[in-house]
Amino acid sequence: MTDTLKLEGVGLDVRDGASLHTLLEIDEFRLEPGEMIAVRGASGAGKTTFLKLVSGILLPTRGRVLYGDTELSALSEPRRDRWRGRHVGFLFQDFRLFDGLTALENVLLPFTFCSRTVSNTQRRDATDLLKLHGVNPDTRSELLSRGEMQRTVLVRVLMQSPSIILADEPTASLDANRAGHAVDALISAAGSLGASLVLVSHDERVLGHFERHLTLADGRLTPRI
């Protein structure tokens, strides 16, 4: 079952010597099931920190992060890790693929890390998805183009069937044409899963692909007019 994710009165503070600095202050944020949102902010605005709060990697200094009726800060770290593994899929700017492993092996890696046996069906599904996205399953990751690396990571997320996909600067280093295709593929993939999507970027080009836009500046999240 997919639930609404909410941030209520959330603040994240850090101490620098005797001074206390507020990194983020978010009065309210809601992500409905299947909703897709773009968050734009300049470099250093706190976009990655925001995603870490949404996913429970970071806990707020004050306020609550809720998934349905579950308050993430009330969970132990192992339970938060399990919640994240079950519900959240990440696309990072640096791809996080392992050299020496094939595209297929990289896609199936989360199942290996979780000590789960990879079934023939999962292997076949991953192979088919890679081919569908134009990636040779047998190519080692260090030999893939940046676009192929990105699509490999997307397939890895699809195989996890998350209810929330968080994308951190997925169009970085891509030209306008490839950036558009990458965002379209991501939106299509999220839609095929019925997953919610939060994409953060400094790239103005991505905004036209989303109905809901937010801006992160000076540590605050506001609707984009």
What are the functions of these language-model segments?
Residues S55:
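Helix-to-loop junction immediately C-terminal to a conserved catalytic motif
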Residues G63-E71:
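Conserved ABC transporter NBD signature motif
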Residues E71, N120-P137:
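Conserved ABC ATPase "signature" region
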Residues L72-G89:
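ABC ATPase NBD coupling module
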Residues R140-Q150:
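Conserved ABC ATPase signature
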Residues S161:
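Conserved catalytic motifs of ABC-family nucleotide-binding domains
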Residues I165-D168:
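Catalytic Walker B motif of ABC-type/P-loop ATPase nucleotide-binding domains
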